[in-house]
Amino acid sequence: MDLRLPDSVPSDEEAAALDAVLGPTTGPDGWEREHGGVHRAATMRHLLLPALHALVDRVGFVSEAGLTEVCRRLDIPPAEAYGVATFYSMIPVQAVPPSTVYVCEDLACRRVSRSDAVHDRSARVVHAPCLGLCEQAPASLTVRCGPTPEHRVDSVVPLRGSVPQQ
C-alpha cells in the first residue's frame, strides 16, 4: 500500500456494502455526487472501521479495490487504512471461505480450548484473542459472510456444545 490510490474499481457487491454505510456516490438523477471535499471527509473518518466491516460482512474480505474505494470516499491514505485493516484479526485482506470460526485462545479459554471441536469442516479456523466470553470458556465465534442477510450469521457458541445463556 502506498500514499496514492491505485486504479482499481470495486465490485458491485463492494459498492453496495459501502453505500449502505457511507451513502451512495450518485444522486437520484444519476450525477456523481460531490462529497463535500476534505471537510466532509474529515467528519466521516470515524466510519473507517464500519466501512471495513461492511465489506467483510458482504464480500468476506477487504480487497484492494474495496480498500481503495473506502480511502477515496473518506479521503484516507491507503497505507493508513491498510494498517487499520491488518491490525484487526477479524478483518481478512485476502479471499477466505465464506465461513470462519474464531477460536478464543485467551487465558480462560486456552486451558480448555479445542479447535478440533469445530463442526463446520469447510470453515476457516482462526485462533483469535479474547472474544469476551470468559465465563463460557471455551468459546468460539462463527461468522458466515455473504451478499444476503441470511448468509451472514454471527453467532457465539461455546465449544462444549451447550447453548449460551440469553
What residue spans do the PLM features occupy?
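Iron-sulfur (Fe-S) cluster-binding modules
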Residues: 1-58, 69, 78, 124-127, ...
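Small-residue-enriched alpha-helical segments and adjacent helix-cap loops
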Residues: 44, 48-136, 148
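Short beta-strand scaffold segments in enzyme catalytic cores
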Residues: 138-142
